[in-house]
């Protein structure tokens, strides 16, 4: 016999829809950043494309470093009874989205006060530090959003991830399009 997938239960689940929204939002945010980071560094900070390609790697290194820490921290908080599993997921996703929002607001603040023609190395260092913080905080998605499917239904986690990932792919497409559009008209 085949696997009887409870599609109607997914659609009616009050826990499933926030997971889908979080996944859509994560992809909208992250793929927009990933796609346009070299262009941003070139246009906003007057950095050559060759140098901006190198600088674009730095935030990813932050993600790799922080990723090695988030699971042990999240597991420790749950295993020691400091936070429930649900609270660990909420904390993780809050750190992911909240950290990104603070970091990108900081980047916007720095860039808005510095005309591209007069960008100093200190400005580049400040912006890259904020972006590294942003990408590092994004690592918390691994103990937030990406554990939610398994928490809701271990048996159907892969199917639920496929559904939310499909919606999230639309977010990726929209963000890269709209960011490009707004850059073109501004």
Where do the protein language model's features map onto the residues?
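Loop-to-transmembrane helix entry
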Residues: 44-62, 88-90, 125-129, 159-162
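Paired intracellular helix-loop junctions of major facilitator superfamily
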Residues: 79-80, 148-158
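A late C-terminal transmembrane helix in Major Facilitator Superfamily
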Residues: 67-68, 154-185
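Alpha-helical transmembrane segments of MFS and MFS-like solute carriers/permeases
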Residues: 8, 14-26, 58, 96, ...
